[in-house]
Amino acid sequence: QFAKPEDAVKYRQSALTLMASHFGRMTPVVKGQAPYDAAQIKANVEVLKTLSALPWAAFGPGTEGGDARPEIWSDAASFKQKQQAFQDNIVKLSAAADAGDLDKLRAAFGDVGASCKACHDAYRKKK
């Protein structure tokens, strides 16, 4: 799928950076620092939902490197569980955005953030 291991590293880093960008755009709304615009939230969640499926294939065997810790490959089952928890939380975030319910959106947003943090704490090298 990737010609060189470094291509996989760049691909997953790019996908994760874009996810962080679209997630971050919703933070002021969730924190009550910006008005709730349902259409804008839905647009960001839709992009996030699409992006959330992308980086995982770029963590295949032989693609070690970047900010990824070796435990991704040595404890692949746990990594996959955290990946699945994240994607399950994205589905909940999408449902909350579709419902237009700010309280549900806040709760789901928190769950997505917590799943991001759990994976980063376990599998991303400290900067």
Swiss-Prot record:
The modification Pyrrolidone carboxylic acid is found at Q1. It is found in: Periplasm. It comes from the Bacteria. Heme c binds at R12, Q13, D67, C116, C119, H120. Pfam families: Cytochrom_C_2 (PF01322). GO terms for biological process: electron transport chain. InterPro entries: Cyt_c/b562, Cyt_c_II, Cyt_c_prime, Cyt_c_prime_subgr. Its main location: periplasm. GO terms for molecular function: electron transfer activity; heme binding; iron ion binding. Binds 1 heme c group covalently per subunit. Keywords: Electron transport, Heme, Iron, Metal-binding, Periplasm, Pyrrolidone carboxylic acid, Transport. GO terms for cellular component: periplasmic space. Homodimer. Cytochrome c' is the most widely occurring bacterial c-type cytochrome. Cytochromes c' are high-spin proteins and the heme has no sixth ligand. Their exact function is not known. This is Cytochrome c'. It comes from Alcaligenes xylosoxydans xylosoxydans (Achromobacter xylosoxidans).
